[in-house]
Amino acid sequence: MAKSDIEKVLTVFAGISAGDVSLATRHVDHKRFVQHNPYAADGVEGLTQFITQSPRDQLQLTMVRAFQDGCYVVTQVTGQRSGRNVFFDIFRFEHGLIVEHWAFSTEAAPPNESGHTQIDGPTEAKLSEDTDKNKSVIRKYYETVHIAGDHSKIPHYVAADQVRHEPGVRDGLAAFLRDLEVITQHRTIDEIKFVLGQGDFVFVAARGTHEGNPCAYIDLYRVESEKIIEHWGFPEEIPPLEETKNKNGML
């Protein structure tokens, strides 16, 4: 039986964790693979180098969530990789092989004020939900609230009892409104790069700034009845191209 694209991504992570280059690259297009992870060189050669030159204890990965939207697979992973502990990855497939990869990461943090970690909560997409409708809701929310800055519309999109997984925060709409007023003093979100979803899960990767420096904003939402009921995510500074191991751009 042929492997699904998600199973192929699991094989990549298994190979990385085991230090097995052959396994990690089994479902990667060896001629066309484009790497956007700023800490790995381009192509299969760069991925091979990343695996072979990294200490084993820094490449231990465990899948938390995975879903597929067309040719894209989105994953949330925990473990150790390059000194980070929580990861979102995007893999793009063509003809059954991985041809492109983006990676985002942050350090682990203690449970937040409501007791949630960066990875707990539902792990399987609820496929009975309307994916296209949920993606549309999130795109409109992001464009209205985070890009245009119209915070008056937040209650239209966010449930009063929203569950939040960011470090240092508390659940609920009221807490989110307070936090956002502070956060937006130091950041801009200028452009959505990805809106990918399956069922009630919708993932967004956007580009903006934090304190004037280029920044990626990575968010996973769970949507129910056209409202955001749960959120995971983090910002990550985008390093200058001259400091990265490939020149394809992080996002």
Residue ranges and their predicted role:
Residues 1-251:
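C-terminal and inter-domain tail/linker signature
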